[in-house]
UniProtKB/Swiss-Prot annotation:
Homotrimer. It is an enzyme of class 3 (hydrolase). Its EC number is 3.1.3.-. GO terms for molecular function: phosphatase activity; zinc ion binding. One of its GO terms (biological process) is bacterial-type flagellum-dependent swarming motility. It comes from Escherichia coli O81 (strain ED1a). The keyword Hydrolase applies. The lineage of its organism: Bacteria, Pseudomonadati, Pseudomonadota, Gammaproteobacteria, Enterobacterales. Zn(2+) 2 binds at H15, H40, H194. One of its GO terms (cellular component) is cytosol. This is Probable phosphatase YcdX. It holds the Pfam family PHP. Keywords: Hydrolase, Metal-binding, Zinc. The gene is ycdX. Zn(2+) 1 binds at H7, H9, E73, D192.
Length: 245
């Protein structure tokens, strides 16, 4: 098991079922050292208000030896790469994931989806693109992976895509992983947990990476320090409380 999980939702996204405390308890049981809460951006129908994200600054950094990153899974809104995260939200957040979600940005043709995703990557506002292998949103894998490598943005391999949602993602995710491998970029693994019980579960992700001989040194979840180095290289100030994770 990798000790970092970068994608999960709490009851603040009302189609999810666990609290921050639930995730902390599960992290302790499973040996997760660092995790990110990434509730849906406010343009989703059942997402929390933008004040929810701004107020994350009151969270403790470490609880019982488990580090907590303040994050969001923002929505890509348009072909210009705009996301539903802005202003003071950026000041409170450590990790910004962004992806396509049908209630906010309907599926388009391959060229339009690719243009939108690359614009988001190039904006400098995101660290990870969520579930880029979604078959509802065809993209040019090579072009997206090369843009992501250029701008130091990771592409996610999402464990939930193989179990509960986005059915038919396997071939696309293998193509994503191979394209990132060839471009020299990063992948991030996300459980996309909507209940704490699936936190840290990456078994299906690892099958995808093994199938394309993906280099483990380009996986962000290998250690807290690797993930923090990545975020710091993107401009996040070092967080003293995480020094001993």
């Amino acid at each position: 098991m990798y000790p970092v999980d970068l994608h999960m939702h709490t009851v603040a996204s009302t189609h999810a079922y666990s609290t921050l405390s639930d995730y902390i308890a599960q992290a302790k049981q499973k040996g997760i050292k660092l995790f990110a809460i990434t509730d849906h951006g406010p343009d989703m129908e059942d997402a929390p208000h933008h004040w929810h994200f701004i107020n994350m600054r009151i969270w403790p950094r470490v609880v019982d030896g488990v580090g907590i990153l303040r994050g969001i899974e923002a929505n890509i809104k348009n072909v210009d790469g705009e996301i539903d995260c802005s202003g003071k939200m950026f000041d409170s957040l450590d990790l910004i994931i962004a992806g396509f979600h049908e209630p906010v940005f309907a599926p388009h043709d391959k060229a339009t989806n690719t243009k939108s995703m690359i614009a988001t990557i190039a904006s400098g506002n995101v660290h990870i693109i969520s579930h880029p292998g979604n078959p509802r949103y065809p993209i040019d894998f090579k072009a997206v992976a090369e843009a992501a490598a250029k701008h130091q943005v990771a592409l996610e391999i999402n464990n939930s895509s193989f179990l509960h949602s986005r059915k038919g993602s396997e071939d696309n995710c293998r193509a994503v992983a191979a394209a990132v491998r060839d471009a020299g970029g990063w992948v991030a693994l996300g459980s996309d947990s909507h209940t704490a019980f699936t936190m840290g579960e990456f078994e299906e992700c690892l099958k995808i990476l093994d199938a394309v001989d993906f280099p483990p040194e380009r996986i962000l979840n290998v250690s807290p320090r690797r993930l923090l180095n990545f975020l710091e290289s993107r401009g996040m100030a070092p967080i003293a409380e995480f020094a001993d994770l």
